[in-house]
Amino acid sequence: MNSHVPRKRLALLISDPSADYSQSVITGVRDQCAKYDYDLLVFSTMVKMCHPDKVYLSGELNIFNLINYDLVDGVLVASLALVEDQVKEVLEKLEADLRLYCTKPVVSLDLPFADYPTVYTDDKKAIRQVVKHLVNDHHCQKLYILTGQKDYVVSEARAEAFCEQMKAEGLDGSKDNVFYGNFWYTGGEEFANRLLSGELSMPDAVVCANDYMAIGLANRLITEGVKVPEQVRITGYDATKDALYNTVSITTYNPDVYGMAASAVNLLHKQIEPGTAVADVEMLQHYGLRTGVSCGCVQSADDLRSLQGSGMNPNERSRNPDGSLTVNDMQGLHESYMFETLSVIQDKKQILDTITDVTYLLQPYRRFYLVLRSDWSDTSIRCLNGYPETMRCVMRCIPQNESESETERRYAVDSEGHTFRTKLMLPALDEERDEPVVFYFLPSHFSDDTIGFAVLQTAMDAKRTADEVSTLWLRNVNNSLHMVRVVSKLIDYSVRDSMTGLLNRRGMEMMFDRRREQVAPDDSFLIWVIDMDGLKHINDNFGHEQGDVGIITLAEAIKSISDKEDIAVRTGGDEFVIIASGRLTEQEGRERISRFERLLADKNAARASRLFDISASIGCVCFSASEQDALDEKIREADHRMYEYKVAHKKQRND
């Protein structure tokens, strides 16, 4: 009897996992989950909510429709990462889903969300320390704050902290020094224009409520000849990599997002397992003020080392003993020529094999899964909202330095055998593991058309999360899958008859050559040649539309008597071919002819007020797969037998 008890699981809903804020949230949640032996399921878009292409964004957001809340024990919603300019459509949709489908406890992060409890980062403490630094260390007297959108809870909280600390310092803490932006580069640029035009007097310092506005403000002023920090000091907030990399590095504040996220896990834990011990929340060393050049300080040594050792520096890389990357290395991804390698592939099987070959770029990871719709390669079928009832796990990758087991093997194959009910999300969730892990569920789509989703499984203590490299890696995969779909469609157009959907002569030759390589030496081929009777008479007397009806009806009969693996072809205006292979005999060829005759008679009988009967002549030839005769020669032989059939039936009708 299996005594395995599944771990408890938390779901984290977030956006753009490579963003600094999201990275801090994920790390804080992950580390605290490890203390409780919880698995963590991260459901995330790969872009921010402010992504300019809203059609593309809708394809990203579909990942949240995958969540089966019955399979998790608690839900964390990173609400601050799921809004744009106070537009809360995504949160409103999530709230509706949670009300309908979720009976588990829910906690919001950093932004009020419905009536769920919210855990906040202490913005006020951070802004106060920034003001103290400017006033006490740089002797600034006249300060402005550039915050986010007016009446937005985060904007107002940071503005309020600014005013309170200004008053505590004995300076002007009135609302006259509060200005509103948009939490983006453009907000800083627009504020710079107001300073440059003289609409606003130049202050000693501007406290920006996030790094993006600080960068926009500083760079715009510098472009117009204003010296930063000599003429005006500028600070940011959030401690993003962009602030660190900026030409004039931005003095910023690293808020304790990590601690906030860990505290949110504790709040869920109290509801999931009431009365049990609550784990301590660790304090990270890098939390607090991070000085840069923009305020007049020297950039901190820790930040310089971070810049030197980052993945943006091709000379400093951390690797595993096998040479694979262990940290974010964008340069390594570029040097892999992954996109170029994938973009030339036209075959569905080959694309899966090649994707498997480049999963080394994701290391260190535990497992990688690619889950696709069973009809993913058909561009005429679109999936815009939600997922089909069943999905297909076409790929399970295990790092090359790890051995397979009897129950867990590597594979990359689009097979019905790997189909599962979508509500399970991923069958591997229930596999027994010695330690808790993280599953990152990320969207696989092209524009708004969902192809499937990817799952990156990592250890709880892995340095890698779903970072810039892994999200760009998956974007390359998504684009290459779509390219295979498009190429397959173009090839399909070139090898199929548009009227009947049967293969054309080119398609027949291509498929026959492929089939000849696949069959066993003791197999046989059966070829039927079919010719519609009296097509010219029908066209001349009843019109070409009726002639087309006859051709389509005949094609339907041919499809009906053809097996799934048969090659069914329209070779000309009124000429058709069927090619079958396997352990076949001439007797089966004759039986198929009898079925065809009966089926065609039934179709004629079913046609209401028919002006004419549809008839056809058919001939068949059977030959060993080991014969080397050309296809055309065998078709001519079957065509000769078809002609004998036609003559015999014409004589029979005349008699």
Model-derived segments and their meaning:
Residues 344-384:
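Helix-loop-beta substructure at the N-terminus of cytosolic sensory domains
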Residues 567-570, 612:
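A short pre-motif secondary-structure segment
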Residues 544, 590-597, 608-609, 621-655:
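Catalytic-core segments of nucleotide cyclases and related cyclic-nucleotide turnover enzymes
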Residues 462-482:
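Amphipathic alpha-helical "output/dimerization" segments
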Residues 337-341, 486-505, 511:
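Amphipathic HAMP/coiled-coil signal-transducing linker helices
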Residues 424-427, 435-445:
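A short, aliphatic-rich beta-strand micro-motif
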Residues 504-526, 533-560, 569-573, 577-578, ...:
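Conserved long alpha-helical elements within nucleotide-processing catalytic cores of c-di-GMP signaling
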Residues 1-54, 59-336, 345, 525:
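Bacterial carbohydrate/catabolite-sensing allosteric modules
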